[in-house]
From Swiss-Prot:
Protein name in the entry: Carboxy-S-adenosyl-L-methionine synthase
Role noted for this protein: Catalyzes the conversion of S-adenosyl-L-methionine (SAM) to carboxy-S-adenosyl-L-methionine (Cx-SAM).
Lineage start: Bacteria, Pseudomonadati, Pseudomonadota, Gammaproteobacteria, Vibrionales
Family: Belongs to the class I-like SAM-binding methyltransferase superfamily. Cx-SAM synthase family.
Organism this protein belongs to: Aliivibrio salmonicida (strain LFI1238) (Vibrio salmonicida (strain LFI1238))
Catalytic reaction equation(s): prephenate + S-adenosyl-L-methionine = carboxy-S-adenosyl-L-methionine + 3-phenylpyruvate + H2O
Amino acid sequence: MANPDTIFSAPIDKIGDFTFDERVAEVFPDMIQRSIPGYSNIISAIGMLAERYAKPHSSVYDLGCSLGAATLSMRRHINQEGCQIIGVDNSSAMVERCRLLINAYRSDTPVTIVEADIRDVNIQDASVVVLNFTLQFLVPADRRALLEKIYSGLRPGGILILSEKYIFEDGVVNELLIDLHHDFKRANGYSELEISQKRSAIENVMLPDPIDVHKQRFQEIGFKSSEVWFQCFNFGSMFAIK
């Protein structure tokens, strides 16, 4: 059973920026399930998409792999000779725990977990690349360069799966979806104090884009097709195919 997320349950005098440290890594499975609507559906479908798009003797990347939920889902579904999965995260606490979880299960598909900045990773001969709630934590100026690097490293016909929180240019829509998301968190046991303090901690480090910005960027980079395949409130997932 996952350790309960109580990080923001008591009043904090000075709230610093949210970081993926040891405290977060310890409660991350509980935090993510109670904070992101549809997370389990996204993880399951990432495995299904990987099964469809992973090719023999290619690489599959999970960039910002955290504790490896997407990596494990893909490994369960991939059955291609010579296909390897590479998970990357810059949090030593996440990487340490992720390796333990990965090594707890045997599989014919090899997995390597690397501690590194995803902006520095060389993407090569990829059939599938996953950015599962990761791009939104990069400074906006670095996002296009990473996506261009991914595009260059993807095989023709390869797929990028990008899950993100979205903002909406229509203020009424944006506020409604934010309110619904907060209702979702309340229904999952978070208090008003926890919701408020978490929002204060994360608002300067997670800067979401509108869906149209994602689509336009995909098109400009050269992806031939892209679409939202899942959305719940202001969270969702897209694919882009080279």
